[in-house]
Design a protein with these regions (language model features):
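A detector for short, charged/polar N-terminal pre-domain segments
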Residues: 1-4
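Short, conserved catalytic or interaction motifs in soluble domains
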Residues: 39
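DNA major-groove recognition helix of helix-turn-helix/homeodomain DNA-binding modules
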Residues: 45-66
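Helix-turn-helix/homeodomain-like alpha-helical modules used for DNA recognition
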Residues: 65, 69-75
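Short alpha-helical DNA-recognition segment
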Residues: 17-36
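Secretory-pathway ectodomains
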Residues: 9, 28-30, 52-54
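Short basic helix-loop element that most often maps to the first helix and adjoining turn
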Residues: 9-22, 59
Length: 75
């Protein structure tokens, strides 16, 4: 399992076979938001994690999707 939120988002997006643009559209955020998540400059909110989990379930990914408790950039 990926070690940080950005890696988890990227891994999940890739497993879903989606581009950043497609993923952003599916979860109703901007492409720059997805990019910031994946590059460790921000982390998804609790609501965003819920939407991401719902998308994964709808697409048949049943892997355990826990919201990582790790801080972003040491904050």
């Amino acid at each position: 399992m990926p070690a940080n939120p950005g890696d988890l988002v990227r891994s999940l997006r890739q497993r879903l076979g989606l581009t950043q643009e497609e993923f952003a559209h599916e979860i109703a955020v901007t492409v720059s938001t997805v990019n910031r998540w994946e590059n460790g400059h921000a982390a998804p909110s609790k609501l965003a994690w819920k939407v991401i989990r719902d998308l994964a379930r709808r697409r048949g990914l049943t892997a355990h999707l826990q919201r990582p408790q790790q801080s972003v950039n040491g904050r």
